[in-house]
């Protein structure tokens, strides 16, 4: 059993090429793909995705890094169904009876945001339950990915939404916004797409025009899969949220990410946020192994 023989190296410890390769070599593939019991397969797949999300930036030898990235993508592709599917368009039905269409390109090692993850459709469905129709609400979405939540907020609630992510993700997000632009305008909403790197946000003296005004809502869906992501998100909330604003989060309670989620939630408490919360069942894109409990929260600042 791989988990009895090997401790999976943690990404935040920046494991070496040989450490990662040793584990990859032991992961069943080909005709032995499903030799692992379900609980081990779940842990392995989460480890692969989490490792991939780091871009393996600490592996400085390009050939070694390329090999690891390629192998990780192959292992994920074998296990992931739609995750590794070629570029296609998906249709999502909203609570007001409208359907939006999103393009999802094939995922690569640095483009996890090309897929619409399990908590995003749930959060899109929840927004009209919590919020009234108002085209005066300005909202910032962090890690917006395909743009589903931001687009749905504009169409269902008439919000003025700024969707942000990394450069490679924003290009596809903009395509999705343009594709659904007539619906967005029909419901008096708006969506703009911009690059926002959590690790390198603009200095206060050099904020772009779209970041100058505080946001009444900040949305983050399925963004807590590294400990430092939670810390960075909290810093952005405090930086860009209006005094009377609300932070809206939802994320799957994946077994391998409970520590990161715990750090994030304690950090929000320590930063002076109080919340309403609940849990519901969502579906990951990994087949029948992956129905998952998702936790939503509406955070208000009381610092």
UniProtKB/Swiss-Prot annotation:
Main localization category: cytoplasm
What keywords are annotated for this sequence in UniProt? Cytoplasm, Methyltransferase, Nucleus, S-adenosyl-L-methionine, Transferase
Give one Pfam family.
Answer: Methyltransf_16
Q: What induces it?
A: By glucose, sucrose and fructose.
- Residues in the signal sequence: none
Matching entries from SUPFAM superfamilies are given as: S-adenosyl-L-methionine-dependent methyltransferases (SSF53335)
Entry function: S-adenosyl-L-methionine-dependent protein-lysine N-methyltransferase that methylates elongation factor 2 and elongation factor 3A.
What family, per the record? Belongs to the class I-like SAM-binding methyltransferase superfamily. METTL21 family.
Q: What is this protein called?
A: Protein-lysine N-methyltransferase rrg1
Its organism's taxonomic lineage begins at: Eukaryota, Fungi, Dikarya, Ascomycota, Taphrinomycotina
């Amino acid at each position: 059993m791989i988990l009895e023989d090997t401790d999976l190296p943690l990404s935040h410890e920046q494991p070496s090429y040989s450490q990662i390769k040793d584990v990859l070599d032991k992961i069943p593939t080909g005709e032995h793909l499903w030799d692992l019991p379900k609980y081990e397969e779940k842990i392995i797949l989460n480890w692969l995705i989490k490792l991939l999300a780091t871009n393996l930036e600490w592996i400085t030898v390009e050939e070694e890094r390329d090999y690891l990235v390629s192998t990780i993508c192959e292992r994920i592709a074998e296990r992931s169904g739609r995750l590794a599917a070629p570029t296609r368009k998906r249709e999502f039905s909203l609570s007001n009876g409208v359907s939006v269409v999103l393009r999802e390109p094939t995922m690569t090692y640095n483009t996890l945001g090309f897929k619409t993850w399990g908590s995003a459709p749930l959060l899109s469905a929840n927004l009209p339950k919590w919020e009234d129709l108002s085209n005066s609400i300005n909202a910032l979405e962090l890690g917006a990915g395909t743009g589903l939540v931001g687009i749905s907020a504009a169409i269902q609630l008439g919000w003025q939404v700024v969707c942000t992510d990394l450069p490679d993700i924003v290009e596809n997000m903009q395509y999705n916004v343009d594709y659904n632009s007539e619906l967005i305008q029909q419901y008096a909403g708006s969506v703009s797409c911009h690059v926002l790197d959590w690790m390198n946000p603009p200095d206060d003296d050099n904020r772009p025009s779209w970041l100058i005004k505080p946001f009444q809502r900040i949305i983050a869906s399925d963004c807590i899969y590294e400990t430092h992501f939670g810390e960075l998100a909290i810093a952005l909330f405090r930086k860009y949220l209006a005094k009377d604003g609300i932070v809206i989060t939802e994320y799957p309670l994946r077994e391998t990410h409970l520590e990161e989620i715990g750090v994030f939630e304690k950090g929000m408490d320590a930063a002076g946020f109080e919340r309403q919360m609940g849990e519901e069942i969502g579906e990951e894109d990994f087949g029948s192994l992956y129905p998952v409990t998702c936790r939503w929260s509406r955070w208000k600042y009381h610092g």
